[in-house]
Every structure is written in structure tokens, then in C-alpha cells.
């Protein structure tokens, strides 16, 4: 019995090591970074007695992987620790809600860097979606982030400097430079 358990544990550890190696060695064109505070610090959208608390990070990550994955193919989050990438993109989300016109306003600011930390440019994407705060707000939020990411991606594709960086050789450990990025101020209550 002990040998079977030991064998099972060793196979489990071996499979984890192999899968971690596959993620690290996967070629990446764009590495995406979203700061931890966008995952941990929840924001509140409100209208009189109706309020909705949410984290921006997971919704933005889903939209970024979907949109940038379609446009630039090999895309990975810095959490996956890609071995190399041609461009590092730092995403900063913003969201607001106007209860009088029932509109969600999404904004994503993308700061693009080379793997060695040289800035390539800033791209701002905006989107609006109409919806009520008390009826499935997560769908409207996801639509706003998705629209803003499509706007950002279109601007990246139109930028000559960004396209030049995509043609360059990939740099090693692009996410190692994220410690040098400025720490943003905490966004209080979604203002």
C-alpha cells in the first residue's frame, strides 16, 4: 500500500514538473501584465440603493486573452511566467456607471514595453454598453471590457513602432521588468 501511494505521489510530482516546463517553454508574442491590486481591490458601482462590488482583474484578463489571442496569436499572462516574449503589455482598467442613462463606461490603458523595459507606447481603449446595474451587471461589464480591449488591439495593430517590436527577436524573461513599473494609486470606490 505504501509503495502504491509513494508511486502515485512521484507520478503526480513528475506530471506537475513536465506541465510547468511546457508553460515556461511555450513561445509567446505578447506577455500581459495586470497588477495584483486589480484582482484584490474590489470596486463598487452604485445607483441609489443598488450596488455591485466586483474585481476588475479577472474580467479584464478574460477579455485581454480572448481579444489579443485572436489578434496576436501567442499571448500569455505574466502569472504563467513565459520564457520569452516580443512585447510586454501592462493593462490598467477603469470602469464607471452612469445610472441616469444606464450606461457602463469601460476604459483600458495599455502600456507597451520591449522585454528589456523600453517603452513602445500607450494605447487607450474605450467602450460603452447600455444596461441596468441590478440586472446581470457582470455581462455588461464583460462587454465593456471586451469592447475596450478591441479598441486597444486595433490601435496596437495600427502603430508602426508596436508592429516593429513584434517583428524583432523575442527577449528572455519579459515579465522580470514588472518590478520596475510604477505602483499605481489605489482606485477608491471606482471614481
Where are these regions (language model features)?
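Sec-dependent N-terminal signal peptides
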Residues: 4-14
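A structural "domain/chain start" motif
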Residues: 16-66, 162-191
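Short secondary-structure boundary motifs at beta->alpha junctions and helix caps
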Residues: 46-55, 116-168
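Short, solvent-exposed, polar/charged sequence segments at loop or secondary-structure edges
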Residues: 53-97, 184
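Surface-exposed short loop/turn segments
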Residues: 78-135
